Amino acid sequence: MGEFVGIDPLGAEKLIRQMEAGKDVLARARPGLEAAIAEAGAEWAGREGVAPMHRTWWFFHESQQDLKWRIDTIKRIVPTQQTGMLTGTFPFSSATEATEAAKRDAGVITAALNYHDQFLSGPSWAGVEKALAALKSRIDDPSYSAALLTALGPTTFQKLIRDWMNTQAAGARRGLTPDTLKRAGESSPGLLARAFAAAESSGRLGNEWQKMIETAPSDILSSLVALAPQSGTFLNRVATNLLTRPPNSDTFPTDPNWNLHNLAKAYEANPEAFRRLLAEHPNEAGVMLDAYTIRSLGVPAYEETLARALHGALKPGVGADDMRERAWITVINSIGSEHTLWVGGGIGTFADSPISRVLAQDITPILDKLARGQAERNSPEVPYLEPRAPWDKLDPTVSARFLGALMQDSTAADTLMKAGTDYMKQLDMGRFHPFDPSNYGREAHINLAERTGALTNLLLAGSTYAEWSDDEYADRLAGFLLMPVDFINNKYLPMDSALASTGKDKGLDDVKDVMKNLITDYLDKKTPDTARSIASTLVNEQVEWLSRSLRENGQKALTASETAMMRDAMEGRIHDALLDALERRGG
């Protein structure tokens, strides 16, 4: 009964591949050898014909099966990412022994369930629990779990979980609550979910179990993926099915919907699967991100859980870059869509949103993609601005709405401003002077300036959707406008002393105050100036500050024509977005 096993999964898998290559050689050689033996007849010099080849082929085949069983089992017993030798005590000494034990246990469970169906009492259900408890030390063996589930069948499997819910969680009608889920994990549903994970992830279940996804109740499926880590393939199949069911398909559609919360919880534990869902199933993933979904579930914990799942899937550096970028595009299109309720809807604002804060925290690597899309729209004639696929299909208007949705949360807005500033520092626009004598230098400066201006443009456009006070709005607008100016100022006007640097920072603060006051006076209707004239004045303030800083720090002053060119360039990059932001807020 059982044995202590030590195995190196990677080495064993390599051996399996080598034996497969040997089987292939034998399979290709055997027909020709058989034909040669038949043709030679009695003159064949060999003694046993092709029989040794048959035995060798079957030796390889049976050894492969045994090794695969051992690999699958040790990975369940020792769930780790480490490589090298893994050790553990197997509940069975062979897959055959595991299969026979599973069939016997399935018979005991079925008999206990039939007895319970006759009496529907506490003691009769205790008998079912006792029969299932015997599985605890055995279900990490995939052959055992597969044989057990095959013997029970999908219908009995679901009934065991449903009967536990009926007896232990009668009030949970749209998925298990966290407390109930915890109790289920420590009882028979948890054991059944673990058995399913062991059997399904190793590819040992028949098609009828995949078809179960189409017919099983939502709470059964959401519990199954929440109670034990299922394979990413199965988890995503469950998700795409649940997320396409009619919103009111549940028996009790007005109850709090814990099913989606438990699905999000499963994705929190499996970032790779969630990243793939976002990238490959944008419509279904969009249901999870929908503002109405978030607000109507009746489960406040859902947004926080979804935020953690998004962070796991999207944080910089995780997974393959192309998969992560496609996942980001789904998130941006979902939250920033034309009819999104994240902004301007009738369900309130997202002023304190963990989702907004997480997305703002993780957005830095894709800011250049967003900026390039806006820059190409602003200046299609400038070379080398266009974003590469798949970002070339993202509408900059959607990007602006997405940023605006995030900026409803003040903390997220601050994070976005910092990310934007860091992005401009990373571009290092000052590597090239706007009036460089070489064509390459000027073109390079224009390219970088277009991208910094485009990001400012997006932030300004997004600000029209943010629900800020007038004072906060004016302060942030002035901050957005000065982001590229601040960078140029620091690049071209380096300070050797802390005192001089403090003075320069004060000068920048002064011009920000001037710009903020201009915006505040306009919003408070303390000036007869129009939004258009205020926008022009704000651009002039930027250019005049740069020109003044150059003179005060002994740098070569801008000529009149250079000043005009700088003003036209800045105005062209941000004027329309700035004007729209002022008109919408001031109106």
Model-predicted segments: where are they?
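Non-catalytic all-alpha helical scaffold/repeat segments
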Residues: 83-587
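N-terminal secretion-targeting helices of virulence/extracellular proteins
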Residues: 1-114, 118-119, 126
